[in-house]
C-alpha cells in the first residue's frame, strides 16, 4: 500500500496527506483480513504509523537513504524491509538513460553497502529483502532490466529473498 508515487514526473506528497492515504486503508484491511501488508514509503513516520496500524513490512524505494530515521524505525519494530536499488538517491526516479559497464556489478556493490548500513543500524539480515529496481529505477534503457532478469541468479550471493516488480 503506497500513498506517494515514485515514478518519473511524480510530485511530493506531504506527510499528512500520505498518512491520510495509507493508514485508514491498512486499518480497514487489518480488521477484515490477516493478509500480508507492505507499506511503500521512504518516510520513517509513515512507516512507524503503518506498522502500528497493522502493516507487516516496509518497502523503501530509497533503500534507507531517504529519511535518516527509517533504519531506526525498522530496527525498533523488527519489521521486514525491502531495500530497492535506484540510480536516483531520492524517492523519485527519473527517465535518465543511465549506462553501466556492468549493471550487476553496480547492483551488487549497492546492496553490499546498503546491507552493511542496515546491519550497523540494528536491522537483522533475516529481515531484509532486496529488489533490483526494474525499469526506470535502473535506467531509461530497457536493456539493463532485461540483463538483470537474465543474470538474476548472481544476486543469490546475498542469500536473501528477491523481489522483482514490473
Protein language model regions, located:
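Short, charge-dense linear interaction motifs
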Residues: 142-144
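Conserved anion-binding
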Residues: 6-9, 47, 53, 64-140
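Acidic catalytic patch
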Residues: 2, 165-166
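The start of beta-strands in P-loop NTPase/AAA+ ATPase cores
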Residues: 35, 54-55, 126-128, 160
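Alpha-helix-loop-beta-strand connector modules within alpha/beta enzyme cores
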Residues: 11-39, 44, 48, 76-86, ...
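Glycine-rich, proline-tolerant flexible connector loops at the mouths of alpha/beta enzymes
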Residues: 1-24, 134-140
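Nucleotide/phosphate-binding site architecture used for ATP/NTP-dependent chemistry
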Residues: 61
Amino acid at each position: 500500500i503506497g500513498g506517494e508515487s515514485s515514478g518519473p514526473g511524480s510530485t511530493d506528497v506531504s506527510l499528512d496527506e500520505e498518512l491520510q492515504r495509507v493508514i485508514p486503508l491498512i486499518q480497514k484491511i487489518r480488521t477484515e483480513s490477516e493478509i500480508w501488508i507492505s507499506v511503500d514509503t521512504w518516510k520513517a513516520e509513515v512507516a512507524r504509523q503503518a506498522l502500528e496500524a497493522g502493516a507487516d513490512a516496509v518497502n523503501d524505494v530509497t533503500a534507507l537513504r531517504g529519511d535518516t530515521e527509517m533504519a531506526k524505525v525498522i530496527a525498533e519494530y523488527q519489521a521486514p524491509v525491502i531495500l530497492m536499488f535506484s540510480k536516483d538517491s531520492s524517492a523519485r526516479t527519473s527517465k535518465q538513460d543511465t549506462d553501466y559497464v556492468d549493471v550487476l556489478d553496480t547492483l551488487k556493490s549497492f546492496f553490499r553497502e546498503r546491507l552493511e548500513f542496515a546491519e550497523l543500524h540494528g536491522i537483522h539480515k533475516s529481515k531484509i529483502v532486496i529488489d533490483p529496481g526494474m525499469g526506470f529505477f535502473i535506467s531509461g534503457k530497457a536493456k539493463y532490466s532485461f540483463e538483470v532478469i537474465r543474470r538474476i541468479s548472481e544476486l543469490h550471493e546475498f542469500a536473501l529473498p528477491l523481489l522483482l516488480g514490473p
